């Protein structure tokens, strides 16, 4: 037998699990995620978080600021891995919390929860370094394929990693997508992971090479069609931790990786939503250098891309 609480205690010390335990954990979490819909319904009160990017010690600070599970209910909007030093430990902790408290934490897919992206931006190399092979990376990528695409809070606030798609007018069109796959290079699934808001009216090509830039008019139309009061997303660094877009303030970016890449100097935030559906933002900074460890083989510039 295994003890999830014991595994959580181990990983919270920024240690990673043996390969056979990690494989078992991935199998458990896949079964849980398979039962979730593409748009997972969540009830208030809930705390919504943006990108983490392997900044493990800052994730522990997030839980200190936002509240610990299971007393606090969470939605994390993807990008758990890459760029930070501890993607493995970060994603392992998320999986452990999902296995231990499946109804208290909702994990959305981000554009970095992908085989192609993680081979470029750090997670693949980190798994190779820590385990001496790519097996654990493969197990985690299989979990990525089952992460849900979005969440909706009290049927009124949509949470998604990137943004909107010109191919999606209704939430039902998201609900019928086949999500158990690598993120496609184009199309609605791709757009949900990659798109960004911009000060335009409609749609234009994204400089990222995937997804779209979308404007105020299409955001308002999408919100009206689907009876939404707010769209929350992550995907873009915000120096102040969060940012409302457009005159209607019907879209907000939440960013939860402070001092991103250990050099950007930004603060981070979490968005607390109670029954009133009025968001309250809690701002936090990166933990002090003396309260974190840095892998001896890592220079800071390696993951800043």
From Swiss-Prot:
Q: Which reaction does it catalyse?
A: O-phospho-L-seryl-[protein] + H2O = L-seryl-[protein] + phosphate; O-phospho-L-threonyl-[protein] + H2O = L-threonyl-[protein] + phosphate
Look up the EC number in the record and give it: 3.1.3.16
- Similarity comment text for this entry: Belongs to the PPP phosphatase family. PP-6 (PP-V) subfamily.
Instruction: Could you list this entry's UniProt keywords, alphabetically sorted.
Output: Cell cycle, Cell division, Cell shape, Hydrolase, Manganese, Metal-binding, Mitosis, Nucleus, Protein phosphatase
Identify the catalytic residues. 112 (proton donor)
Q: Which SMART domains match?
A: PP2Ac (SM00156)
CDD domains, alphabetically? MPP_PP2A_PP4_PP6
Give me the gene this protein comes from.
Answer: ppe1
- Source organism of the structure: Schizosaccharomyces pombe (strain 972 / ATCC 24843)
Q: What cofactor is needed?
A: Mn(2+)
The free-text function statement in the UniProt record for this protein reads: Has a role in chromosome segregation. May provide a dynamic connection between kinetochore microtubules and kinetochore chromatin. Negatively regulates mis12.
Query: Where does this protein reside within or beyond the cell?
Result: Nucleus
Q: Name one GO biological process term.
A: negative regulation of isopentenyl diphosphate biosynthetic process, mevalonate pathway
Q: How is the cofactor bound?
A: Binds 2 manganese ions per subunit.
Q: Per the record, a Pfam family?
A: Metallophos
What PANTHER family does UniProt report for this protein, alphabetically?
A: SERINE/THREONINE-PROTEIN PHOSPHATASE PP2A-RELATED
Q: What GO CC annotations are associated with the protein? A: chromatin; cytoplasm; cytosol; nucleus; protein serine/threonine phosphatase complex
Put simply, this protein is called Serine/threonine-protein phosphatase ppe1
Complexes and interactors? Interacts with sts5, ekc1 and mis12.
């Amino acid at each position: 037998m295994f003890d999830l609480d014991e595994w959580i205690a181990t990983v919270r010390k920024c240690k990673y699990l043996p390969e056979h335990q990690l494989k078992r954990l991935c199998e458990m979490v896949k079964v849980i995620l398979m039962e979730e819909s593409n748009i997972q319904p969540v009830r208030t009160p809930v705390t919504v978080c943006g990108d983490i990017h392997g900044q493990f010690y800052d994730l522990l600070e997030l839980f200190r600021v936002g509240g610990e599970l299971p007393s606090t209910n969470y939605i994390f909007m993807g990008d758990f891995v890459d760029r930070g030093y501890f993607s493995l430990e970060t994603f392992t902790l998320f999986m452990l919390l999902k296995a231990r408290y499946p109804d208290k934490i909702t994990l959305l897919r981000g554009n970095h929860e992908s085989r192609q992206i993680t081979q470029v931006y750090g997670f693949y190399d980190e798994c190779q370094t820590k385990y001496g092979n790519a097996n654990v990376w493969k197990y985690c990528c299989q979990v990525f394929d089952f992460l849900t695409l979005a969440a909706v809070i009290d049927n009124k606030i949509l949470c998604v990693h990137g943004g909107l798609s010109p191919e999606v007018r209704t939430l039902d069109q998201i609900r019928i997508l086949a999500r158990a796959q690598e993120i496609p290079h184009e199309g609605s699934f791709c757009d949900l992971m990659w798109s960004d808001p911009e000060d335009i009216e409609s749609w234009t090509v994204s400089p990222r090479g995937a997804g779209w830039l979308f404007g105020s008019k299409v955001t308002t139309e999408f919100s009206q069609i689907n009876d939404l009061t707010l769209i929350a997303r992550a995907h873009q660094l915000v120096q102040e931790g969060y940012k409302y877009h457009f005159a209607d303030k019907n879209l907000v970016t939440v960013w939860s990786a402070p001092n991103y890449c250990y050099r950007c100097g930004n603060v981070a935030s979490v968005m607390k939503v109670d029954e009133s559906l009025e968001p309250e933002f809690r701002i936090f900074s990166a933990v002090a250098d003396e309260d974190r460890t840095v892998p001896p083989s890592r220079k800071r510039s390696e993951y800043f891309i």
